[in-house]
Structures are given as structure tokens and as C-alpha cells.
Amino acid sequence: MSDILSEMSDTQASPLTKDFKIDLPEDVSFIINTIEKNGHQAYAVGGCVRDTIMGVTPNDWDITTNALPEEVKSYFTKTIDTGIQHGTVTVILHSTGYEVTTYRIDGDYLDGRHPSSVEFSDRLTDDLCRRDFTINAMAYNERTGLVDEYGGIDDINNKVIRCVGRPEERFTEDALRMMRAIRFSAQLGFTIEDNTYKAIEKLSANIQKVSMERVCVELKKTLMSDNPDFCRLYGTTNLFKDILPQLHDSFTKRQSKRILLTCKYSEKELPLRLTACLSNGTPAQAEDTLRHLRMDNKTIETVVKILTFSKDNIEETEPAIREALHKCGRDIFELVIKYDFALVKASEEVTFISNPARYNHLV
């Protein structure tokens, strides 16, 4: 989704309406039509509808239906029980999987992440009302057209991230949704609606209920978006205050502007953007933060080396740079150059390192 902003520009030259037509892939149409021929409803739903409306090719297609899982399985030759206890069956067509999920009403979220039970429903509206954001609560089929009960089209037109229903309820159900709001904001270049933002601030401590592995996934998606500087929202909402204090400081303290600009000016490589976010501490502190975040070992090692050999930690003389190149190797040194160039651009400094061409002959 990193190129959404550029891909959606032509689509949104004029405001979208509920009459919007979606050209469903052949396999998706086949699944929906097959379920309908057996007397049930079926719709494409969620992110695939959102992305298509915005002119972006979806990574996958999800389908929602009032057919029960066992009924769905009986209609297709090859299926996989991927989450049948929650109503999800994966239909395999032409080596591609399509998740088909029965309309459901979620029970209580006792752990702040997952429903303790689900109840299957016969009404599409029951399924849409449990979803996180309005832009993800739209459904579509060729017979009915677009179903948009919560103003998803309006929020796409106005570039707004807004919860379905009461934000506090949505975030109490699943605390990860607070990070997802910020991640979608960064990926789409959208603003978080006031009540949704205030609910994140109020419930920020609940993020401790989310595993660090899931936190890591959302942070990486935010950093690899076209707006990595939106990471400041992880600080201003206090989401990272208790779970990732170094990153919280990076996004809120006096040096946050330089850090976020460095992140923005860095090329779209995860180690570079992580280095920018962790440049307010030592390489050892960065390593501790990344291990707590459950980052992979290769990325941790790369970030630590970039910080160790960056312009802040080595003399900007040719002998010192040659020595650094020898110690860290060509691949890491090229990342050091890229990081330092972004750092200088962010700091509006003119230094030796600000002109990589001056020492490209050393690499």
C-alpha cells in the first residue's frame, strides 16, 4: 500500500459516490455468484473494497456471506479450514486462496484483542458494524452494488480515518486498532478524526495488551509508508510511552523534529528509517529497544552498525572513513552514507558527508 497516494490521485479527481462500480476479479465473481446461486448473500468486503475504490490493486480479496462454513465448503471443490471456529473458510481457485467468512456478531473481547465467542448472523449489517474503521466497513457485489452504511465513501473523499460507531468501544475491543489507525493514516495520508484520536489518547495504556510482535508489524508498515513522519502520532497519543520509551522520546522530545525529518528523507529501507527513529540514543540502547520490539536479528545488527559508523560517531576525515569502510563492509557503509545524507538534509547542515559523490571512489 506504500504507493497508494500516487495511485489514487486519478481515481479521486472528482468525489466518489455510492454508485461506484467495481470490476471484480473473475474468481471473486465466481465465488460470490456460486454462493448466491445456492440461495445466500455474498459480498467482497473490507480492505479489498477500500483499495479498489481508491484505485489500488488489492493484495487479496475477502468475501463475507450469510452461508454457514459447512455450506461454503460444500459449494467448492477445494477449501481449507483456516478459521472455521470464527466462520472463515479459504476457497482455493487457480492456486489462489480467498477467505470466505460467515456474517458474525462478536462476543466480549475479554483479553482486549480477540472475541471470546462469535455468533453467526444472517444480516450483513451485523457484520459491518463490528469492523474497525468506516473505510474498511464497505461491501460490494454486482447485484447490489456498494453497501456503505457508515460513510466510508465520504471519509475517503475527506481523507479521514474514523471508527465505526463509538471509538472507545472499538479500541477497547481490540487495542491493536489504535496502531492501525495511525498506520492507515500514514499509508493513505489521511487525518485521524477528532473523536477517534481522543479515544486513542484516552486508551493508550491498553496497547500493553498487544504482543510486541504485532506492534512490530504495525510500526514497520508505518515506517515503510510514504509518510513515515506520521510516527509522531505514536508519541503524541502516548501509545509508546510505556511499551517503547526510547521511541516515545524520539517522537515527543526536543529532537523529535530532526528525527522525524531524517526518517522522512531516508530512502524506503527499514534499517535506515529505524536508525533515524533510534538516533537519540546509543547503539546499545537501540539494540535493546529493537530486541524488545522482537525485530529480526539481521535488521537489529544493521541498525546498530549504521549508528556506530554514522557521522555522529566517526570523524569526517578520509582516513577515518576508510577505516569505517573496512570495519563495517561495503553494504553497511552504503547505508551509512544514505543515513548521513538524510540526517544532514534534515538538519540543514553542510558537511563533508552531505556530498556522497566526494567519497564514492572509496567504496
Listing of model-derived features with the role each one plays in the protein:
Residues 1-363:
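Catalytic cores of the polymerase beta-like nucleotidyltransferase superfamily
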